[in-house]
Amino acid sequence: MSKSENLYSAARELIPGGVNSPVRAFTGVGGTPLFIEKADGAYLYDVDGKAYIDYVGSWGPMVLGHNHPAIRNAVIEAAERGLSFGAPTEMEVKMAELVTNLVPTMDMVRMVNSGTEATMSAIRLARGFTGRDKIIKFEGCYHGHADCLLVKAGSGALTLGQPNSPGVPADFAKHTLTCTYNDLTSVRAAFEQYPQEIACIIVEPVAGNMNCVPPLPEFLPGLRALCDEFGALLIIDEVMTGFRVALAGAQDYYGVVPDLTCLGKIIGGGMPVGAFGGRRDVMDALAPTGPVYQAGTLSGNPIAMAAGFACLNEVAQPGIHETLDELTTRLAEGLCEAAQEAGIPLVVNHVGGMFGIFFTDAESVTCYQDVMACDVERFKRFFHLMLEEGVYLAPSAFEAGFMSVAHSMDDINNTIDAARRVFATL
C-alpha cells in the first residue's frame, strides 16, 4: 500500500469519511485521495514523493502559487508577536483600508473566519436591514454550509426550498427560494410571487460550484434591476472570484454594483479569512452600532490579517491578472484543441484565473441543467489518467479549476500534452 492509502485507512477510523471537507475524499471520482506533504509554486508533493502540477490551488486561495515568500514571511513575523489577542489591532485597520480601496463598492468591511461565515452573516444582515425573511439563491450555486443555503434545487423555474441535508428543518429552508442561474424569468417569477417578502438575492457572479459557469451578459445587470424594483438587496458572493477574475472582483469585470459583497479564499492568502461588506447604511445595522448581531473569537486574527495583507498587496501588482488570463486562456484553448484531435466532445469555460472542463456534446454550458447533462463517468476516467500523468485537477466534475501566476507556460504546455495522451485513450 502507498502512504496515502495507509493514511486514508487510518483517517477513516478517526475522522468522518477520513477527511475534514467532503470533496477531498475523492467521492466524486473514486479511489484514494492524495495526502499532501508539501507544496511550492505551482506544484503539490504527496507523501509518496510524487509531484503534481496543481490546478486546485487549495480550492482558490493560492492565486500567487504555494508557499509565496511574501506571505510566508508575513506569517512568521506576525507569529513572533503573538498568535491571537481577542482585541483590535492596527493590522485590522490596515487590512480594512486595503480591501475597501481595492473593492470600491465596499464602504465598510467586517472580517470573519471563512466564506461560510461571510455569506451567513451577510444574509442575516440583509434580513435585518430589510425586515424580510425570504432569500433567493440559484440551483448549482454554493455559498457555504449555513442552514438556509443547504437547499435542494427543484426542476421548475422557482422552487420553495427543501433541505438538501438532514438536520436542516423544512420550516427554516422554506424561506430560501431557488431560481435558475442565467435565467432572469425565474427570478422575476419569485419576486412577483413574494413581492414584499424577499430580503436579498445571493449569487456567485461566476458559478464556481457547478464547475465554472460564467454569467450571460444580461444576467447580473438584470438581478441588480430586479432588486431595485422590489426593494431587495443584491449580495454578490465573491469568495471564489474576488481578486481572481479581476482585482476588484467579478463585479468590476462585469460592471454590476452589489449592496453587499462576500469575500474569502484569496483574502487570507491561505489562512482562514472571510469578509463581508458593502453600503455604509447597511453595514451600520451591524452590531455594535446596529441591532444585527455577528461576532467571532478569532475574527481579525493577527496572523491571518498579516497573511491576507501581504497576499493582497502582491495581487494588486501590475500584470498579475493579465498573466492569469493569458495562462488560463492558453490552457483552455489547448485542451479543446487536443480533445478535438481525438474526437472527444469538450467544452472548457474560463474567465480570469478560473476554468471548467465539461465532457459534453453541447456547444455551451450556461446553467445547472447543462452541467448535469455532462458525461461525469468520462470525467472520472480523465481525472485519474491525468493524475497518473502528474496533473492534479479538482476531484469532481462539479468544481472549478484555478490557475496561479506561479504556473509557467511550460507547465501549461506539459498539461496539454498530458491531456492529449489521455484523450487518445478515452
From Swiss-Prot:
Q: What are the required cofactors?
A: pyridoxal 5'-phosphate
Pathway(s) this gene product operates in, as recorded in its UniProt entry: Porphyrin-containing compound metabolism; protoporphyrin-IX biosynthesis; 5-aminolevulinate from L-glutamyl-tRNA(Glu): step 2/2
Which transformation does this protein catalyse, written as a reaction?
A: (S)-4-amino-5-oxopentanoate = 5-aminolevulinate
Q: What is its EC number?
A: 5.4.3.8
Q: What does the record give under GO molecular function?
A: glutamate-1-semialdehyde 2,1-aminomutase activity; pyridoxal phosphate binding; transaminase activity
For this record, an example GO cellular component is: cytoplasm
CDD domains linked to this entry: OAT_like (cd00610)
Query: What does the similarity note say?
Result: Belongs to the class-III pyridoxal-phosphate-dependent aminotransferase family. HemL subfamily.
Q: What is the name attached to this protein's record?
A: Glutamate-1-semialdehyde 2,1-aminomutase
Species name: Salmonella heidelberg (strain SL476)
